[in-house]
């Protein structure tokens, strides 16, 4: 028999899709993609501020159709005839917005801010059917099994990220302080269905048995991730070519992935389709999970640097 568990997955920074049955469907097919965007830049406040922005949209769709016919010749003289057909469609679309702001408050102080926001989604649909017949040593062709696999779903996602840099000179030449901070937040929601049906002829009467093997499941998946990091650096000139650099770095990240699986309340089916019925659906703990990861890292360090036109030497120590 055939069938089994699956469920596609569509991820990406505002533009991405996927999914799969893991069967005969592979790459290739017909793919169309497109993109377009806008860019702009401005000098403001008598040149003290440089501001630029950009927007990009891209999308794609693909279609794959495959068919196979295979004959296996057995040692005893019998033959297995295996036929498969399959189709796959995928669509994606996403938007990206970005800004770059570089502002100089004075010859000694400036900031740089580069935020970006992406959002988008996609959908997929895959279907394959199969049949296997046996030609015995008596030359008679008999039914063995037949069925189909299908999976389909859609997702929505967004990502917000950015970088902030503050730079400050502190009077004495070479004495500086800087702060570099980064952030990233993302979310992806997906609903997908995984269905399969397999019929067999166990008693070899050339009639399909009345109780096919059916998989009829729904998946609700959510992925969230967050990260923050920052690095503070102070530089002090000790002598003409000797500098002391003291730094502190902090980073935090958290990710959570949840997958809830459900079995259909009923299993109504026809030729090439199964209906998922949310009424009476049952949570499937075996294929559900929740994973949480969280990390915090801190580091402090001191570095002595000797710099000349031809040589740079460093000696440092750090603690986590």
Tell me the role of every PLM-derived stretch.
Residues 1-320:
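Primarily recognizes Gram-negative and organellar outer-membrane beta-barrels
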């Amino acid at each position: 028999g055939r069938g089994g568990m699956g469920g596609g997955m569509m991820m990406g920074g505002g533009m991405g899709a996927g999914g799969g049955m893991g069967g005969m469907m592979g790459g290739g097919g017909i793919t169309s993609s497109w993109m377009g965007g806008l860019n702009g830049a401005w000098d403001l406040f008598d040149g003290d501020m440089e501001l630029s922005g950009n927007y990009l949209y891209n999308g794609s769709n693909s279609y794959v159709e495959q068919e196979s016919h295979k004959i296996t010749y057995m040692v005893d003289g019998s033959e297995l005839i295996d036929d498969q057909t399959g189709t796959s469609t995928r669509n994606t679309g996403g938007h990206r917005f970005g800004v770059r702001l570089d502002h100089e408050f004075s010859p000694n102080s400036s900031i740089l801010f580069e935020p970006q926001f992406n959002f988008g989604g996609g959908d997929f649909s895959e279907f394959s059917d199969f049949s296997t017949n046996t030609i015995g040593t008596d030359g008679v062709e008999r039914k063995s099994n037949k069925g189909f696999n299908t999976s389909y779903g859609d997702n929505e996602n967004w990502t917000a990220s950015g970088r902030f840099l503050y730079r400050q000179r502190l009077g004495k030449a070479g004495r500086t302080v800087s702060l570099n901070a980064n952030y990233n937040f993302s979310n992806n929601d997906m609903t997908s269905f995984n269905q399969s049906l397999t019929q067999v002829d166990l008693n070899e009467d050339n009639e399909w048995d009345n109780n096919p093997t059916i998989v009829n499941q729904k998946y609700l998946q959510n992925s969230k991730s967050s990260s923050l990091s920052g690095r503070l650096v102070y530089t002090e000139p000790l002598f003409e070519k000797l500098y002391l650099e003291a730094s502190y770095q902090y980073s935090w990240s958290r990710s959570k992935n949840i997958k809830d699986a459900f079995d259909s309340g009923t299993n109504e089916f026809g030729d090439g389709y199964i209906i998922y019925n949310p009424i009476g659906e049952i949570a499937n703990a075996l294929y559900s999970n929740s994973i949480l990861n969280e990390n915090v890292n801190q580091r402090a360090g001191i570095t002595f640097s000797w710099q000349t036109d031809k040589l740079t030497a460093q000696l440092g120590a750090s603690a986590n």
